[in-house]
């Protein structure tokens, strides 16, 4: 009974604020989302359609260490803030209005935030975080070739069992820090220039667009996987994705000695460099990395000039990686 009273006291201000809105028609779109199954529903809006104007405030108002789900609805707009989903804020579901219509933007860099891992616009440490139809952007200027400390992370995800559906990730160098944990990305748009998906997560990317904005006369890179030891179960897998852009990229480079990256049934445009992969200046990693391609197609998928340590995988070899079982998704998705 005490919990029930506390819960009512938390949600009643939201209801009372919504009732005071003078122009309810402009806010109808926020009332069309199904809320069944959520213990709490919080609304964020720059236009007076919710209790909060900042996403961080809504996250802070959610119940900590909860076994039930909280829904955070984020209205149209550009939210110029940096927010953190702390470790005790689990089971959050964040719903935007479309990744081209709802975005979180900040502009830190490695230099301005004392390290690449701290340069994020958004960081997720809590478990079972889910985001729909929202963009995460780092708007720091594109670095010149050879620039030092210009890395700029849009999203850092550390919490286990995180999923992103129809989301956008925008930056230049080091856009998406897929640091650790099991993660699922479905129908997302990911843009960057160098190492724009990096970290040591165990993650499946399905039906995503990977868009290179590397500068002309340079070679960018999509992935920099951080698998450090043979026993790690981590790696990045891309299934039914599309690689586009305006300048050449490698599929991956060996940030750590046991880097593991697989592309399956992915369209590769001409932006993919003919050699495909890079050892990051350390030939020893050629014996330990696991770089695989499986049934990929398009002008960038020609394997005839690939580096010798890249693998063309058979259906049997690819099978352990190309479905949600790679991330134990049948247990949590």
Curated annotation (Swiss-Prot):
Pfam families assigned to the protein according to its UniProt record, in alphabetical order: Pectinesterase
Source domain of life: Eukaryota
Any one GO cellular component localisation term in the record: extracellular region
GO terms, biological process: cell wall modification; pectin catabolic process
Tissue-specific expression: Expressed in flower buds.
Catalysed transformations (reactions): [(1->4)-alpha-D-galacturonosyl methyl ester](n) + n H2O = [(1->4)-alpha-D-galacturonosyl](n) + n methanol + n H(+)
One example GO MF annotation: pectinesterase activity
Function in brief: Acts in the modification of cell walls via demethylesterification of cell wall pectin.
Full protein name: Putative pectinesterase 14
Organism of derivation: Arabidopsis thaliana (Mouse-ear cress)
Lineage: Eukaryota, Viridiplantae, Streptophyta, Embryophyta, Tracheophyta
Underlying gene: PME14
């Amino acid at each position: 009974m005490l919990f029930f009273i506390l819960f009512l006291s938390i949600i009643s201000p939201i209801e009372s604020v919504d009732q005071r809105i003078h122009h309810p028609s402009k806010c109808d779109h926020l009332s069309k989302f199904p809320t069944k199954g959520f213990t709490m529903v919080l609304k964020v809006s720059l236009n007076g359609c919710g209790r909060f104007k900042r996403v961080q405030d809504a996250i802070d108002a959610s119940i900590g260490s909860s076994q039930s789900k909280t829904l955070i609805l984020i209205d149209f707009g550009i939210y110029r803030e940096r927010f953190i989903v702390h470790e005790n804020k689990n089971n959050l579901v964040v719903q935007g209005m479309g990744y081209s219509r709802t975005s979180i933007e900040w502009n830190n860099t490695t230099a301005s935030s004392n390290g690449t891992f701290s340069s994020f616009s958004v960081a997720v440490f809590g478990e079972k975080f889910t985001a729909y139809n929202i963009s995460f952007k780092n708007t720091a200027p594109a670095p010149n070739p050879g620039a030092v400390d210009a890395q700029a992370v849009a999203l850092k995800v550390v919490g286990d069992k995180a999923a992103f559906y129809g989301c956008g990730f925008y930056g230049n160098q080091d856009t998406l820090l897929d640091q650790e944990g099991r993660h699922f990305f479905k129908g997302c748009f990911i843009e960057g220039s160098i190492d724009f998906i990096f970290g040591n997560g165990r993650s499946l990317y399905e039906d995503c667009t990977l868009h290179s904005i590397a500068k002309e006369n340079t070679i960018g890179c999509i992935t920099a996987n951080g698998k450090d030891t043979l026993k790690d179960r981590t790696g990045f897998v891309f299934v039914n994705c599309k690689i586009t852009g305006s300048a050449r990229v490698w599929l991956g480079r060996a940030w750590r000695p046991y880097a593991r990256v697989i592309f399956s049934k992915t369209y590769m445009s001409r932006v993919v460099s003919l050699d495909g992969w890079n050892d990051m200046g350390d030939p020893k990693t050629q014996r330990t990395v696991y770089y695989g391609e499986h049934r990929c197609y398009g002008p960038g998928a020609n394997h005839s000039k690939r580096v010798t340590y890249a693998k063309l995988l058979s259906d049997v070899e690819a099978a352990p990686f190309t479905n949600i079982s790679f991330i134990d998704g049948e247990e949590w998705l």
